């Protein structure tokens, strides 16, 4: 099933919106009962790289406990994730499909910059789901995104810091660290704070 989810305006840097999409550590706290839950809060070590041959960021070998990995999920599962960032304002997620565990569901976000601190996020999903109604699939994704929006609109600084001295990451932030390094290497400035104040 292909599900275009429509555009959602967000008062944040377009780069912050992409970075949030890549962050799994917030799942138990922001998407409680859906994409995560306590006490399953640990992010196990995973692999992140800049694939030089295609100039993309890839995060692989990610596993995370999810109470409801998709609308089609009937029980909690250990979900496998792979993230791909082919462009600064585009990210693609391949994740375990609950009804077909050997296959991937695909969720993508295309972020349209409006200003350096405002954007429109255009998510879509390609899923194996033969039981859910289209409206239910759309509502499931919109619920998750609206939970994210309240976090995104309150992050400080509003621009995404690219100077590693501006924020102190932890091990679970590895995808963000590599994404920011990749953006800096590409000379990204729009929506970014490039130096410490």
Please name every model-derived segment:
Residues 1-197:
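C-terminal catalytic domain of Rieske-type non-heme iron oxygenases
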